[in-house]
Each structure stands twice: as C-alpha cells, then as structure tokens.
C-alpha cells in the first residue's frame, strides 16, 4: 500500500516551454489567467500591457512587466491550489508514478487546518485525508468567490500581503509611465522586474517582500526620476496646449471667421 505525500501539480515549466516573443508571453499569460480566474481577470492584465505599450516602454521593460504583473496576479493561494489538485493531470500523474492502492495525505497550511507552533511561533500545516480531493473540486468550481466578501481566506495574512504588493506594483507601472526616458529606462526596467525576487510562502515570502520593497524605494528615489517627470510633464502640457489651440482654430473657422 503506497502512501503519497502529494504536492500541487505545477504549471508547465517555462524554462522548457518559454515563449520567445513579447506577444507570445502575453498570450500565454492571458490564457493562464483565464484558467486561474476568468476572462475579465485576464483582461485586466492585457489592458495594462496595452497601456504600457502605448506609453512608450521599451521591449525589455514590457517583458519585465508581462512577467512581473502576471506573477502578482496569479498568486498560488488556497483557491489556486484547489484548482491544480482538481485537474485530471494530477490523478493521471499519480497513476503513472505509483502502483497499487494509494493513500493520499495532504499537508494543508490554510484555515481551518493550519496553526502556529507554540514553541517557534511559526505557521505549521495540518494533515487531511483523501476526502480533500472532493473539497478541492468544490473549491475549484467556486473560485470566482476569490477576493469577495464571502471568501473565507480573504483576510488571512498572505491574502492581505498579496493585495498590498499588487497595489504597489500597479503604482509602479504608473510611475514608470510618467518617468520614462532614455536615462531612466534601465532603472525602471529593474523596478518592473522586482516581482521575480518574491518567492515562497509565509515568513519566507514576507522576507522577500521586505527586500523587494527596500530596493523599490531605492529605484524610485533615483535623481534621474525627477528630471524625467518634469520633462514628460512639459511635453504633455505642450501637447495639450497645441490641441486646445487647434480646437479653438476649428471653432473659429466653423463660425465663419
């Protein structure tokens, strides 16, 4: 009787199947986000990339954005773990890997199974039997509840941190668009690539987030940013002034002047 301490089925390794062009990367991520949540959620991603393209970011910055934004949107939370366990490929992998009658044991850190070690104060996982597969299947069907008021995981520490980091990154995208120049391109590309440094779960992830936030502050404080912002503002103001003059000229011409 074999016992399998199962781990969630992992997404296809991008190291082996990495899309080469920016458009291919975006298309792949849109497909993944549609499966992760829904088409509207994937649209949020694609619309941001379109905005960044139109904003003048170069290829390297757009690639960093395409990967970084996806990583923060597609957080592997309780709903995603349930979806991965519910995929037919998980059962197929078990059948191909093990012979005989399997006994599955799931180590679950989320409420209501997880807890805190009384000695170390660190999170610990609880065990659940094979009946969890049915629970995962039910969760996968209702993953649209993620982030809503009835999401039982919405206010746990990891979910709150994920929302904070995502909001900060979206602010960084706005920052990059308003401060973009030839002199700031490399710094802003590094800023948009910071999510690649965030890994793990629990206290490990918190440590990586803290390190990324420190680097974020350093990059945003680069003296070249204020120069680029002032220059971009002047260009924008000039365009608006010319457009206003053109509209005034059209009104004058149409009135018979």
Residue ranges and their predicted role:
Residues 1-246, 254-257:
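Active-site loops and adjacent core secondary-structure elements that bind or stabilize anionic groups
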